[in-house]
Amino acid sequence: MHDRGGRVTRKDVARVAGTSVAVVSYVVNNGPRPVSKALRERVIEAIKETGYRPNGVAKALALGTTGTIGLLVPNIKNPYLSELAHAVGNAARQRGLNILLGDSADDRQQEASLLENFVLNRVEGLLFYGVDGCPPELEKLRDTTRVLVFDSWDSPSFAHCMRLDEGAAAFKAVDHLAEHGRQRIAMITGPLDQRNSRIRMQGWAEALRARGLQEDSNLLQSAPYSRSGGYQAGEKLIESAVDFDGLFAANESQAVGFLAACSEAGVSVPKDVAVAALNGTSMGSFTIPSLTTFEQCVADNAESAVECLLQANEPQLLAAQGDLIRRSSCGCESSYV
């Protein structure tokens, strides 16, 4: 069953799984061609049965370590997640570790497939940012891998968690718009089937109630967490008969899209509509006008997350740090930071 040196090969796995060596490679490398769920599971079972380990980690496994941690994010095109990935990479390299990065592309099936890939590659730890919460596939890492989950309210009992109080952050941003005298504050939410979207919307509503302002469902537009999503939601709000003088976006990319919609429609920001957003990045300094955002301390949070992943034995709950950065879009003086 094995080659002459006694080493299990992909050919052995293919024989046990009843498939081709190419298909085994697609499963191990997570591409480049798709593999059906049933066939993928068959290959994974064959890998477990034969004891096969992917090339590149065999020597490290013999020493009991791979020197690699994984980072799985839902969409690397999201500027905040790009900054997080960069910061995690820096924190890992400072500790002599490699990073294996996975991008789910906002697809739960892709997310599950990538989790299987991390298991196969025997990462020592996994930093996980879910498409929407924690999928059941995370349980497969319970006995083998340290896990830290970002911004989840349903993290498994064995995992560490780093979480921003997104409701409080949204409250602070919306309340700041109200401080500028805005009375009708609209919101671009994320997809409403995602829990974090609902938490951010709750923060918006609580801020309005605290100021005695009206909650109006006509002031809400749901959109993907993207520039195009924010642009399309902005078009709908501007073209509607709804009167609004403030806008809170659930993330920075949506806010950037909204600014573009305002520019095309001749809506002045902040004169006509004051704007603030959640999960800002350095990009907010360079929009026109510059964007007021609640920004997480990404570098510090990444350092804390990696250190916790490597050192803490019992599951820890870490509070992500951040603050509101006031720039021009809300009516404050611009701050290029």
What does each model-identified segment do?
Residues R122-G130, A186-T189, L220, A241-Q254, ...:
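Periplasmic-binding protein-like
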Residues M1-T66, S334:
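N-terminal helix-turn-helix DNA-binding module of bacterial transcription factors
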Residues V21-S25, L61-N75, R184-P191:
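Short beta-strand segments enriched in small/hydrophobic residues
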Residues P74-E83, L101-Q110, C161-K172, I188-A233, ...:
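Hinge/beta->alpha junction and helix N-cap segments in small-molecule ligand-binding domains
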Residues Q183-R184, E215-L219, S268-D272:
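Short acidic capping loops at alpha-helix termini that bridge into adjacent secondary structure
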Residues E235-V337:
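Flexible loop/turn connectors
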Residues K37, E41, T50-N117, N121-E124:
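Amphipathic helical "hinge" segments at domain boundaries
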Residues F128-K172, D193, L213, S253, ...:
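Flexible loop/hinge segments that line or gate small-molecule binding clefts
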